[in-house]
Amino acid sequence: MDKKDFKDEKLLYNVRETAAVLGVNVNMVYELIKRKLLPALKLGSLKVRKTVLIEFTEKYEGMDLSDLDNIKEI
């Protein structure tokens, strides 16, 4: 990957962007991070790596996450 490609590639998403990608509200993203279901890092504000979002959606595909105390298959 050359420098031009790297600059055009978004690697980190803030909480608002993460919520938009996942189609949930920001409170759900904060809760997923708090419960360590969605790994994040803090660089000024909380950020989620693009690869983490992909892994998260693959890991929880077919699961109902609407109640984080009772995650189950759909």
Give the label of every model feature segment.
Residues 14, 43, 67-70:
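Generic structural "secondary-structure junction" signal
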Residues 41, 52-53:
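Short secondary-structure transition/capping segments
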Residues 1-6, 68, 72:
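Compositionally biased, disordered extreme N-termini, encompassing classical targeting presequences
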